[in-house]
A protein has these predicted regions:
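Enzyme catalytic cores with a strong preference for nitrogen-chemistry domains
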Residues: 1-329, 345-354, 386
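ATP/NTP-dependent adenylation/nucleotidyl-transfer catalytic domains that generate, transfer
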Residues: 135-137, 193-194, 206, 220, ...
């Protein structure tokens, strides 16, 4: 009772206790005694009444229960002073240290009605609790050994709509078992795309022959949200994102396809009271950089894999078109640098001469010495062909032709330069029988931060599904592993250069005046918004809330709100640019290709 009260005070909505917690799992043949069975029943009634004072919280407890002359190992769902349902353990182990068949009968599919303390209660292995009017929070139960079998009941539960699986367990500790248990629970939550609450026995059990460590776990879709340290008997709390679970299942067209008919049995949906809605401080961790692993070893492995995907995508395109020359507009910025590095790798795999990589630098009104020099040095260190074409004269002629005043620095002024550059790249591609390699990244495409038919257009966009926050790490990884000190120094300086299209004149001291993140907002925010919106269908209100948690030490709520509005408006307004994107390789779970992941009007 104290634990139930404590859970309520901690604003828990669902509380789970271990298998047979009312009596203890290690009673052995005492389970055959009428006194123990009767007292367990009486304790259930007592706990049922006790939950009446904690409105809107579901409590799941375990006990031995007699039905039709046989004893079952069951879980009982209690809420608002009522017993919502009873679920029996389906798989009774009788091997190694387990001899449960000596006392318990296996559970059954389907459901029957039993009377407990004057109330009709559903009892059976095909029971799902649906809370109030919510069509998302659906709870089902399996007990300990059920999970360790080849076909756990949770598979049936999930395929019939359960989004949260509760497992009441009495899993003892042996060498290495906790690691296996952790992977088992985590893996099942991933396989079933569900929340999985695993509550197991601890210090309250006998240690006659086995020891229990209270290794409690809460997982969600392959992620461990909370884990108790063994032998501490601590309760763990976590926030399960049911919206995310439902979004992922909705996206997966194969979630319930080609399933055996016995998996799609007639389930009983028990309508429960609403879970209490309370404002609480989320305990869930939200990564500020969801595209970038925190661990360096994992991050380096991710970078290598992404570079391989980009490289082999381009390699195949070059082979298929019998193309031995490429054309890249080199600005000295992040995106063109990454595109060049990928192209170099592709040429090396194909044993093509790097001189076939035509790097075109096209300085104009906003070009600074820093970016220009980095572009030149980088091209030289990589052994590619460098061509410099100053476009000031041609852009001025274009302004004169269309009647635009060069002193008016508006969108015409900026985009005229971008389209002039693209025209030059396309013509040089024809001149060299080559292919224009696109440099734009996914973050820019999500925001529409590209000139339509300017830098927006190419013949193959190698960065099209790489977010800006990841571009930096890819270049850093290349700099750290290229074994060329001079090239590495150039790449590091590129990383230190502010992101800019350099379409407006520089400051008087020659530094970059036009900084992208001052205009459209921080890319770390936009990548966070993009990831959660496209990957999990998170709406603006929820997105604002979780962004405030993730960036609590970086941005004020007002700043986050400002850039969230910017992202949302630009994302939908700029779809026309994404509708005609060039081909490019998908590298992660989020992409904006109109032919693949993002098909929207």
């Amino acid at each position: 009772k104290e634990l139930i009260t404590k859970a309520y005070d901690n604003k828990a909505a669902i509380v789970s206790f271990p298998e047979l917690c009312i009596t203890g799992y290690t009673c052995n043949d005492l389970f055959l005694q009428d006194t123990l069975i009767d007292e367990a029943y009486n304790s259930l009634i007592d706990l049922k009444k006790y939950t009446g004072q904690y409105e809107g919280m579901a409590v799941v407890v375990g006990l031995p229960y007699m039905y039709m002359g046989k004893l079952y190992n069951v879980a009982a769902v209690l809420m608002n002073g009522h017993i919502i349902g009873l679920v029996p353990k389906m798989n009774i182990p009788n091997y190694a240290e387990f001899y449960e068949r000596r006392q318990f009968k296996e559970g059954f599919k389907g459901n029957v009605s039993v009377n407990i303390d004057g109330e009709d209660v559903d009892f059976g292995g095909s029971l799902i609790c649906q809370f109030g009017s919510s069509n998302k929070v659906k709870l089902a139960i399996e007990i300990c050994e059920d999970l360790w079998t080849p076909a756990p009941p949770s598979i049936r539960h999930a395929l019939n709509g359960a989004t949260i699986i509760v497992n009441l367990s009495a899993s003892n500790e042996t060498i290495g078992k906790s690691a296996y248990r952790r992977e088992l629970v985590k893996g099942q939550s991933a396989r079933l795309v569900c929340g999985y609450i695993y509550s197991t026995a601890g210090d309250g059990e006998s240690t006659q022959d086995i020891v229990f460590g209270a290794h409690n776990l809460i997982c969600e879709n392959g992620t461990v949200l909370a884990e108790a340290k063994k032998f501490t008997n601590e309760a763990v709390y976590a926030d399960i994102d049911v919206d995310r679970i439902c979004s992922e299942r909705r996206r997966m067209s194969t979630f319930d396809v080609n399933v055996d008919e016995d998996m799609k049995e007639a389930y009983k949906y028990v309508t429960c009271p609403e879970l209490k809605k309370r404002t609480l401080e989320l305990k869930r961790y939200f990564d500020k950089a969801p595209f970038v692993p925190d661990d360096k070893k994992e991050r380096d492995a991710r970078c290598e894999e992404i570079l391989d995907i980009q490289t082999y995508g381009l390699k195949k395109r070059l082979e298929h078109t019998n193309c031995k020359n490429t054309v890249i507009g080199i600005s000295g910025g992040l995106d063109s640098t990454l595109a060049l590095l990928v192209t170099v790798r592709a040429f090396d795999i194909l044993n093509l001469d790097r001189k076939g990589i035509n790097c075109i630098t096209m300085p104009c009104f906003g070009t600074t010495d820093r970016t220009y020099n980095n572009a030149v040095k980088m091209t030289e260190k990589l052994g590619c062909t460098l061509r410099e074409i100053n476009i000031k004269k041609s852009v001025r002629q274009h302004f004169e032709d269309i009647g635009h005043n060069e002193d008016v620095h508006n969108v015409t002024y900026e985009n005229g330069q971008a389209r002039e550059r693209t025209q030059i790249l396309m013509d040089i591609a024809n001149q060299t029988n080559g292919m224009v390699i696109g440099t734009g990244d996914m973050s820019e495409l999500a925001l529409g931060w590209a000139t339509y038919n300017g830098d927006h257009m190419s013949m193959y966009g190698v960065n099209a599904s790489v977010p800006k926050t990841l571009v930096r790490h890819l270049i850093r990884y290349y700099a750290d592993t290229c074994a060329n000190k001079e090239l590495s120094e150039v790449l590091i300086d590129v990383l230190d250069t502010p992101v800019s299209p350099e379409l407006l004149p520089p400051n008087e001291d020659g530094t970059i005046h036009q900084k992208t993140e001052d205009l459209v907002g921080p890319y770390e925010l936009h990548d966070f918004f993009m990831y959660h919106m496209l990957r999990f269908g998170v709406g603006p209100e929820k997105l604002f809330r979780i962004a405030n948690i993730a960036f609590a030490n970086d941005y004020s709520p007002a700043v986050i709100y400002k850039w969230l509005r910017t992202f949302t408006w630009r994302f939908f307004a700029q779809q026309f640019k994404r509708s005609c994107l060039p081909d490019g390789p998908k590298v992660g779970s989020v992409a904006v290709s109109p032919r693949g992941d993002l098909r929207m009007p």
